[in-house]
Amino acid sequence: MLRTHDAGTLRASDIGKGVTLAGWVGHRRDHGGVAFIDLRDASGLAQVVIRDEILESSGAHDLRNEYCIRVTGVVEARPEGNANPNLPTGEIEVAITELEVLNPSAPLPFQIDEHVSVGEDARLKYRYLDLRRPHQHEALVLRSHVTHAIREVLDRHNFYDIETPTLTRSTPEGARDFLVPARLAPGCWYALPQSPQLFKQLLMVSGMERYYQIARCYRDEDFRADRQPEFTQLDVEMSFVDQDDVIALAEETMAACWKIIGVDMPTPLPRITWHEAMDRYGSDKPDLRFGNEITEVTDFFANTAFRVFQAPYVGAVVMPGGASLPRRQFDAWQEWARTRGAKGLAYITISDEGVPEGPVAKNISEEEKAGIAEKVGAKPGDAIFFAAGSKTSSQELLGAARLEIGRRCELFDPSDWAFCWVVDAPLFKPTKEAEASGDVAVGTGAWTAVHHAFTSPTPDCLDTFDTDPGSALAYAYDFVVNGNEVGGGSIRIHRRDVQERVFNVMGIGPEEAQEKFGFLLDAFKFGAPPHGGIAFGLDRLVMLLGGFETIRDVIAFPKTGNGYDPLTAAPAPITPAQRREAGVDAKPKEPSGGQTSNAEAYKSTT
């Protein structure tokens, strides 16, 4: 063995023991013939003392930060007054008798120090150095503890950890696929899975009944600040269950995760319907750490002469103390709204005497001015922000304003936790609305799925969802923590006729459905059981548990917000030879039957 002990595990009880440690030089300090080194390994750090007789003979004078070294010595108590109560090893030091440099270090691109600010590009380019910083190291340790806790719960409930394919066929699931050329079938392509959705349903048909997987998923989306093209999710599926069964298991699993950080999750968690969440909070993932709910005032302004409020929906949210804001800050709110696609954010201020003032107040009636503060719950000194237009977009704008007000006015304690389930979301939404929000609409119909095409309608909607898609509800449930959607799932469709009806609403006809999803539809013919499941975003879960700023902090080797990897410089061009060999430009053969067949393409090569 290269070492006998881990540096961070030494305590006062080890005083007098001979030890051999190995790790990195964190800091070095020289004090008149004595050198002190903070020796760091994965367990923490210990102070190493190199005295005169060893200092000259060991080459310790040449040591620099991040040299990899091995030392042998004796654990001693630190001199009186030199103990460090902020360090687990702060009562001891190791007086060394031998020192060996295992590997020197080149000059560092940045200091391995929590207190030094480092740009993200540099951190990701030298990620192996960034991970030596304790905070980043702890992120991956926490991630390991979380997956261990998850497995313990699911193992207790007799779940099977089963892998599903990484190379599969491209199927429309709501995002763009990453495609991989199939060299042995020129012109044909694999797709990396957006989720294990279809395979886990097939596992339920196969009789496995209880499946889970910590699965890698891939989505070729337009990159956003806190998204990754590849990510990890906890994927769970169960047969012969209803919504309550899945939620109960999910709560037990999540409670085990929060227990890691010393938080007792109160179960059962509250449930709120999707429509209630939108009406009260302007979000389908509401932050329940504070109130300050939005208020609909459409009826209040039903007879208004103010043209802006002559809209299908008018809503309001109060900013406590907002009347004292200078005009430039109200102008900044307008710009804030425009960055979210709105024309602006109308507002009224309530003076200390309770009189409505501001641009909107000049355009509404005396009766409306007299009643608006009471209607929305505003007090003297408050400001009221309004949104008017389509219901969904207006509610979303007010919901975003509510969150911004909560942060600016410190309406909640950032260390608090608020959990809930959002249930009974719409099964479908208009395709134009989905595309306008940047989503990929599956199918060519006027309606597309809100969650995915395999979500079952609620039992009450089973007979009417295709004749009245706008009123149909999904048998689905989302796990929300502090305004973050951490997990989501649903009871699945298990009957071929129901699945075909859903496809039809989405504009996926019988031939297309059979071509793209025939393997699933055919499986449903063989006694597919009722089943449901859930998936949790593991990256986001660990980020929240550890209080990290982005999911990149909890991924070992993440990519930037635009999908670039500074460490390996990926993605990168391929050579012309690779392109030819992979068949990137090849066209698939047309079989005699007319329909393109992967199977026939592969048969022609064997």
UniProtKB/Swiss-Prot annotation:
UniProt-listed Enzyme Commission number(s): 6.1.1.23
Region spans: Aspartate: 197-200
BP term (GO), one: aspartyl-tRNA aminoacylation
Predominant localisation class: cytoplasm
Ranges in coiled-coil conformation: none
Biased composition (Basic and acidic residues): 578-590
Xref: PROSITE patterns: AA_TRNA_LIGASE_II (PS50862)
Renumbered residue ranges of the record's region Disordered: 568-606
Ligand binding (L-aspartate): E173, R219, H451, R492
UniProt-listed Pfam families: GAD, tRNA-synt_2, tRNA_anti-codon
Bias (Low complexity) ranges: 568-577
Subcellular location: Cytoplasm
Binding residues annotated for ATP, in chain numbering: R219, D220, E221, Q228, E485, G537, L538, D539, R540
Catalytic activity, as annotated: tRNA(Asx) + L-aspartate + ATP = L-aspartyl-tRNA(Asx) + AMP + diphosphate
GO cellular component: cytoplasm
A GO term, aspect molecular function: aspartate-tRNA(Asn) ligase activity
Superkingdom assignment: Bacteria
UniProt keyword list: Aminoacyl-tRNA synthetase, ATP-binding, Cytoplasm, Ligase, Nucleotide-binding, Protein biosynthesis
Annotated site, Important for tRNA non-discrimination, chain positions: H31, G81
Protein family according to the UniProt entry: Belongs to the class-II aminoacyl-tRNA synthetase family. Type 1 subfamily.
PANTHER family tied to this protein: ASPARTATE--TRNA LIGASE, MITOCHONDRIAL, ASPARTYL/LYSYL-TRNA SYNTHETASE
Subunit text: Homodimer.
Protein task: Aspartyl-tRNA synthetase with relaxed tRNA specificity since it is able to aspartylate not only its cognate tRNA(Asp) but also tRNA(Asn). Reaction proceeds in two steps: L-aspartate is first activated by ATP to form Asp-AMP and then transferred to the acceptor end of tRNA(Asp/Asn).
Protein name in the entry: Aspartate--tRNA(Asp/Asn) ligase
Annotated organism of origin: Cutibacterium acnes (strain DSM 16379 / KPA171202)
Taxonomic classification: Bacteria, Bacillati, Actinomycetota, Actinomycetes, Propionibacteriales
Gene that this sequence comes from: aspS
